[in-house]
């Protein structure tokens, strides 16, 4: 599922991400825009680590989810990677909360590249929240 921006903003807010660990809703929207284009089915393979990033938050199979094929995987969120690509993003959000609790928002490269030190207010502009 490719979320519409405001629909995703409302969903993330409902699931408790607004200001979770001090990260604003606008920052989460920016992160998911640049990681996946708001697409729950997004996947990207990383040849160097033989791992794959899954779902709207592009959660990595080496550290956070189990896809059954990544060498030396840790499965820190105790979730199958396929569950991170469901249209219902509850499990993906739970894992994102776990990641930001352990490593902070800088765990996401796209956030560092595209959102840090940027005005991200436009990501929630015009949304009825």
Swiss-Prot record:
The active site is at 35, 53. It catalyses: Hydrolysis of (1->4)-beta-linkages between N-acetylmuramic acid and N-acetyl-D-glucosamine residues in a peptidoglycan and between N-acetyl-D-glucosamine residues in chitodextrins. The keyword Ligase does not apply. Disulfide bonds join 6-127, 30-115, 65-81, 77-95. PROSITE patterns: GLYCOSYL_HYDROL_F22_1, GLYCOSYL_HYDROL_F22_2. Residues 1-129 form the C-type lysozyme domain. PANTHER family: LYSOZYME C (PTHR11407:SF28). Monomer. This is Lysozyme C-1. It comes from Capra hircus.
